[in-house]
């Protein structure tokens, strides 16, 4: 690809992303569409100002065994509970997704476990390149398959990058 063609491709991609300035009124209008996903814990939801926001990136971090994966599982079930048309994408980099746990949580939340499992789209990422590819494919779930993806869980976002890019 020549430099001129490459530049045209980059400019077309930028145009399609609508990057640039918007008015404060437009930001307010978009913020009105933001919803909160409950954790089911009143104290945790209070700490998170009502729950985890949609259209946002929220990182949970902590020591091994501190409950990060459980938060992802809980948010997945609660997203499905709160919106009967919602789908959840779960990008699993460390093979920690447990359908058995989803069943337990769904039963506890009064959600049909089969429905919950059918609306959680799980992909196992085997390295950082595969993780990036899967991330790019989420858009296709929405645009091509018409799925109302309301939550994307990446467990763990940094695991492959830490392992593959040591010291960088």
Feature-to-residue mapping (PLM):
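Conserved inter-motif catalytic segment of the P-loop NTP-binding fold
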Residues: 83-168
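General structural signal for secondary-structure boundaries
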Residues: 2, 23-24, 127
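Helix-hairpin-helix
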Residues: 1-10
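The Walker A/P-loop phosphate-binding site
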Residues: 9-115, 119
């Amino acid at each position: 690809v020549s430099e001129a063609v490459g530049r045209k491709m980059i400019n077309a991609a930028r145009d399609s992303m609508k990057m640039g300035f918007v008015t404060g009124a437009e930001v307010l209008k978009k913020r009105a569409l933001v919803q909160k996903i409950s954790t089911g814990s009143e104290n945790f939801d209070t700490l998170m100002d009502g729950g985890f926001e949609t259209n946002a990136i929220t990182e949970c971090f902590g020591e091994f065994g501190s409950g990060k994966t459980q938060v992802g599982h809980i948010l997945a079930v609660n997203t499905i509970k709160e919106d009967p048309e919602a789908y959840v994408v779960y990008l699993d980099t460390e093979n920690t997704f447990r359908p058995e746990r989803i069943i337990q949580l769904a039963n506890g939340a009064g959600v049909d476990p089969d429905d919950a499992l059918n609306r959680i789209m799980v992909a196992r990422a085997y390295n950082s390149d595969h993780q990036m590819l899967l991330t790019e494919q989420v858009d296709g779930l929405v645009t091509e398959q018409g799925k109302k993806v309301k939550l994307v869980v990446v467990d763990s976002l940094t695991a492959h990058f830490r392992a593959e890019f040591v010291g960088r």
